[in-house]
Amino acid sequence: EYLIAKSQNGKFILRIEDTDQERFVEGATEIIYNTLNMTGLKHDEGPDIGGEYGPYIQSQRMGIYMDYAKELIEKGNAYYCFCTKERLDALKSSNDKGDAFSKYDRHCLTLSQEEIQKNLDAGMPFVIRQKMPTEGTTTFHDVVYGDITVENAELDDQILMKADGFPTYNFANVIDDHLMKITHVVRGSEYLSSTPKYKLLYDAFGWESPIYVHLPAVMRDAHNKLSKRHGDKSFEDLISEGYLPEAVVNYIALLGWSPSDNKEIFSLKELEQCFNISGLSKSPSIFDMKKLTWLNGEYIKNMDTESFYILAENRLKNAIKNTTLDLKKIATLLQKRLETLNDIPRLVDFFDSLPEYSTDLYVHKKMKTTEEIALSSLKAALPVLENLSDWTESNIHDALMSLVQTLGIKNGQLLWPVRTALSGEPTSPGGAMELADILGKEESLKRIKIGIEKLQNVL
């Protein structure tokens, strides 16, 4: 909705649709506000900022819906229904032919005006149903799916106003979309089947229908739609798992929409400028967590270092208790290696304390190292580093590279053992020089000595 509005110089309106009291969720409105704020999707009108067509909370517009429902009754396009729940339940069980109930049988359509008034005067509960045509067809146009035609005989006399005085979702939306001058109605393709009823409501009032844009479903896999009830992640879940809001927005924008080129990374501003309805697809999209994770990693890599540090600082402080370590240096190492912010604790825990590790880590085919080579390299590196008076990354680099030349070995045959001894991990953010610089001289020498001892014990 947001991109369609902005790409056509329109307004993006926030309307709280809370007329279904059975599905009302406490705190849901706050989640909507928080999500819009985090994603940068700024609405032009809404409950919090007002606008020309308020109020923007449907439960505050209750008087409006009943008036329009009664107008339809007067026009002959709707009617009162006094059927009890027991009668409707019995109807659902079977009809006269023993078939499963699929449509209301219009029992109350034939009530006389006197009977209707008598029931109303007696305070009998009622709903208001839309009177559907029983012959002919209804056709509507959808931007994505084209012209769709249904047989009117298949349409049920849907409820417009419920017995509790609240409008149904379908009816309230038609009324509010018209009154708020909504030009584009954007929703999931599962609502295609109810759109003929919308179209007939617009026709009954003599209003122009909006432009319909039905979007394909987002799937967990080839057979199942995404569903929070089945454990699929919400936006809040993704953020709590270390995904960036802008990366999630970017990825979701690409589900069911293809840009004119092969570009995959867009800022919100770029999406607003290049989005085009013509790029929407009919085919369902599969929510690929691996693709989102890759995209998130690209966003992290492309951030400026200061912005990344601000983002990562709290996680670094929670993960690393040693306050003498330079967290900014650690952040610089991490930035090019992270996929999500929640990877941080796992990647930095060795800075606090050296984990227990196997000497198998010293064996690396590509680096051409064995346990014997690793032991020899660490023994050679120890005195060189001990004699280093000015402990900086540059000086550590020069000292170790000079030692490589002296020993006549490959770079990796020295640097891999030193890196392994310093981290105790199969992989680490940063190599031997960076880790030694951050850990400091005393801790680095201590860990190298532990590495030597471990190797001596197995050789």
Describe the predicted segments one by one:
Residues 365-400:
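Long, amphipathic alpha-helical coiled-coil segments characteristic
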